[in-house]
């Protein structure tokens, strides 16, 4: 049987990434050109800057991904691409490159939901058994997803306001930490104590919804009031207290979801899945099901995860036409 190679593109935000997946499970290359340094001084991602960077480097990323995989353009069997959710300008760069490559070589084009990519990155650890439950935590999303089979995703719970990664970056900015602040807050939290009483919104409510805006506001108010009074607060203790509140919320809702949807596997994915505190809480408290977390290199945005997610779409022959467009607000269906 002839080997099949998927060339995958990911440009939904501030990472330009191209990857090659061989025979559905062997990631041969996963090139990532990060723009973090360009966005740090703004304290967040500037969409126009992100789009321009994607244009500048995407051709080189394609060449590097193919070279690293040890294949040529003629060896590629299909092209996969993120078409949402994300920044519309950034998405369009990846879409344009993917469509051009697929059209020029007469290859099928596979559309992939960015969040499906995060979830299916777990496939790199071991073959997934369905049904399963997933906790997806990133800068733009916090949601619980029930997956009845590969490619069939249903949201069973999500945030009403801020995503957890967004809350991390906002409190990090208040403390003067470098963007993105998640890793630094995690490190500082492990050096401090949970001594500040921050709210755990909706933690006792009988639903699977999250809320982080109240926690974020309480943190900002405490920090602001201390500054006004000239009081000194421990950054380590602030981080420890904030992270403890976040983890309490995430764990409470995840446990409720596992009670409601009996599964054997819990996937935890997205950029925040790299958080050491979250991994420690999962290991200590989720013991009745197997917890699968993608390796750190596949937690952030990358094309490797898009390649893994494209396999089920390819098997279903879910191919896109040349009119495939960016869908910045693309979302999974909600469980009825």
Swiss-Prot record:
Per UniProt, where does substrate bind? 136-140, 169, 182, 186, 275
Record-linked InterPro entries: ATPase_NBD, Gcp-like_dom, KAE1/TsaD, Peptidase_M22_CS, TsaD
SUPFAM superfamilies per the UniProt record, alphabetical: Actin-like ATPase domain
Cofactor details (free text): Binds 1 Fe(2+) ion per subunit.
Name the keywords, alphabetized.
Acyltransferase, Cytoplasm, Iron, Metal-binding, Transferase, tRNA processing
Membrane spanning stretches: none
The source's domain of life comes to Bacteria
- Give the EC number: 2.3.1.234
Lineage start: Bacteria, Bacillati, Bacillota, Bacilli, Lactobacillales
Quote the subcellular location field of this record.
Cytoplasm
Protein's job: Required for the formation of a threonylcarbamoyl group on adenosine at position 37 (t(6)A37) in tRNAs that read codons beginning with adenine. Is involved in the transfer of the threonylcarbamoyl moiety of threonylcarbamoyl-AMP (TC-AMP) to the N6 group of A37, together with TsaE and TsaB. TsaD likely plays a direct catalytic role in this reaction.
Q: Which Gene3D superfamilies match?
A: 3.30.420.40
Q: What is this protein called?
A: tRNA N6-adenosine threonylcarbamoyltransferase
Instruction: Tell me the organism.
Output: Streptococcus pneumoniae serotype 4 (strain ATCC BAA-334 / TIGR4)
**What residues does Fe cation bind to?**
114, 118, 301
Q: Name one GO biological process term.
A: tRNA threonylcarbamoyladenosine modification
């Amino acid at each position: 049987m002839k080997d099949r190679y998927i060339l995958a593109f990911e440009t939904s935000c501030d990472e330009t990434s191209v990857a090659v997946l061989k025979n559905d499970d062997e990631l041969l290359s996963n090139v990532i050109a990060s723009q973090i340094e360009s966005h740090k001084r703004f304290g967040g991602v500037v969409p126009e800057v992100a789009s321009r960077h994607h244009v500048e480097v995407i051709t080189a990323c394609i060449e590097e991904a193919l070279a690293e995989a040890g294949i040529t353009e003629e060896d590629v069997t299909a092209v996969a691409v993120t078409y949402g959710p994300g920044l519309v300008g950034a998405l369009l760069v990846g879409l344009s490159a993917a469509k051009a490559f697929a059209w020029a070589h007469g290859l099928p084009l596979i559309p992939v939901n960015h969040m499906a990519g995060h979830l299916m990155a777990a496939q790199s650890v071991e073959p997934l058994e369905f049904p399963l439950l997933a906790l997806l935590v990133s800068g733009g999303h916090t949601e619980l997803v029930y997956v009845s089979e590969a490619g069939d995703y249903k949201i069973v719970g999500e945030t009403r306001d801020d995503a957890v990664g967004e809350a991390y970056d906002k409190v990090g900015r208040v403390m003067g930490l470098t963007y993105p602040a998640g890793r630094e807050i995690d490190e500082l939290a492990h050096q401090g104590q949970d001594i500040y009483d921050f709210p755990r919104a909706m933690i006792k409510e009988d639903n699977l919804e999250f809320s982080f805006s109240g926690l974020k506001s309480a943190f900002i108010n405490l920090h602001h009031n201390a500054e006004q009074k000239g009081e000194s607060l421990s950054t380590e203790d602030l981080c420890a207290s904030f992270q403890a509140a976040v983890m309490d919320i995430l764990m409470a809702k995840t446990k409720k979801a596992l009670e409601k949807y009996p599964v054997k596997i819990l996937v935890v994915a997205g950029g925040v899945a790299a958080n050491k505190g979250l991994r420690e809480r999962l290991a200590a408290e989720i013991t009745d099901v197997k917890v699968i977390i993608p390796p750190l290199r596949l937690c952030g945005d990358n094309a490797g995860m898009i390649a893994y997610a494209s396999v089920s779409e390819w098997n279903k022959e879910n191919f896109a036409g040349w009119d495939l467009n960016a869908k910045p607000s693309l979302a999974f269906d909600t469980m009825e």
